[in-house]
């Protein structure tokens, strides 16, 4: 897809999210019940007024087939709903809901996603998405693969350890203002980050995203309905997703062509960007994305701390959209980019451009 100015106007009108290191007192249904209720109540809608519901989660992570069916209890047992699900990050569920709204049969949609990696082994789960013949049987962990990518960038002189540390420091300082940030510190120092030992060479602990449990809920509305529900909706001006080759060996891992193309098709260059929320598993990946999106000093990056501060499998991408949307709705920014990624080494990328009026 492409710039939405030739399509039906759709906006984010309400968001709710929560992330923590370990969800020890509630399960996924209880977590999402609160988030979905908060999301609906903030704009005064009931489930009867929601035309479509779409969720994103992982059966592999939950360890149970069709696990998302249980989480539908958080939406409510009644009334019956028009519902769909993607085994992907919630950002891709939002794309499906956006397409549904384009058809014109409904005016509102609820999107939510969640993950509880503390209950299992995220490195084993993510290994199953690799090439089933040559790579997955070796069970390489996601951080080791990301470390190979970082080493390629360093050896080619495209990034430095200093730039990686600066990116990690930015995340921790920005995250200090975000109650959902699991790893944050106003007092973090560049010297301390540089002196950290590598845990997956060349990545230090601060270079790797902080795994967190959590979830996110978003309500979309079209046209006049959006204006009636929200004083300042965050309009989706463009949304697109692209994918690179599944085979790591045929890709240039120092780049992300799919991220570049998705941003271009979404209309990144139509106006200035006040904010960018980008989704990367490592500081090196954030640097790749900043280059692919050609972000300059006028664009503030990851004011929430990004996924380096809190990374919830299946929800981090949707949370990036919610972070941009919430700042537009509150009037803090006028235009922003939200990015979500899936697969190893930035294989598949979604870009959403949001604007206020």
Predicted regions and their residues:
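Flexible glycine-/small-residue-enriched beta->alpha junction loops
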Residues: 109-157
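Generic N-terminal amphipathic, Lys/Arg-enriched alpha-helix
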Residues: 8-24
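Short, contiguous, pocket-lining structural segments
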Residues: 138-145, 156, 163, 185, ...
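Signal peptide-proximal N-terminal region
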Residues: 38-49
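Claisen-condensing/thiolase-fold acyl-transfer catalytic domains that form or cleave C-C bonds
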Residues: 2-9, 29, 33-34, 40, ...
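Short, well-ordered, mixed-charge alpha-helical segments that flank or form enzyme active sites
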Residues: 117-121, 173-178, 345-346
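Flexible, glycine/charged-enriched surface loops at secondary-structure junctions
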Residues: 47-48, 159-165, 178-183, 232-233, ...
């Amino acid at each position: 897809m492409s710039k939405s100015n030739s399509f039906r106007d759709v906006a984010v009108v309400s968001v709710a999210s929560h992330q923590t290191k370990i969800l020890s007192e509630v399960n996924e249904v209880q977590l999402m019940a609160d988030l979905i209720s908060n999301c609906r109540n903030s704009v005064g809608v009931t489930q009867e007024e929601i035309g479509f519901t779409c969720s994103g989660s992982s059966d592999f992570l939950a360890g149970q087939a069709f696990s998302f069916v249980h989480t539908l209890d958080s939406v409510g047992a009644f009334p019956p709903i028009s519902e769909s699900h993607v085994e992907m990050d919630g950002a891709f569920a939002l794309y499906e809901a956006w397409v549904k709204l384009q058809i014109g049969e409904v005016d509102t949609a609820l999107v939510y996603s969640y993950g509880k990696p503390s209950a299992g082994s995220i490195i084993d789960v993510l290994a199953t998405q690799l090439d089933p013949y040559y790579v997955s049987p070796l069970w390489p962990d996601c951080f080791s693969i990301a470390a190979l990518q970082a080493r390629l960038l360093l050896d080619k002189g495209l990034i430095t350890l200093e730039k990686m540390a600066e990116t990690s420091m930015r995340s921790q300082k920005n995250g200090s203002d975000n109650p959902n940030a699991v790893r944050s510190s106003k007092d973090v120092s560049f010297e301390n980050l540089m002196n950290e030992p590598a845990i997956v060479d060349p990545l230090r602990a601060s270079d790797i995203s902080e795994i967190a449990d959590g979830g996110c809920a978003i309500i979309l509305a079209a046209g006049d309905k959006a204006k009636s529900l929200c004083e300042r909706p965050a309009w989706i001006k463009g949304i697109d997703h692209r994918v690179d080759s599944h085979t790591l060996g045929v890709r240039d891992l120092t780049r992300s062509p799919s991220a570049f193309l998705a941003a271009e098709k979404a209309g990144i260059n139509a106006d200035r960007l006040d904010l960018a929320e980008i989704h990367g598993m490592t500081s090196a990946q954030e640097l790749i994305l900043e280059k692919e999106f050609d972000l300059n000093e006028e664009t503030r990056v990851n004011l929430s701390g990004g996924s380096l501060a809190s990374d919830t499998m299946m929800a981090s991408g949707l949370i990036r959209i919610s972070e941009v949307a919430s700042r537009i709705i509150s009037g803090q920014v006028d235009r922003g980019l939200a990015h979500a990624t899936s697969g190893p080494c930035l294989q598949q990328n979604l870009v959403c451009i949001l604007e206020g009026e």
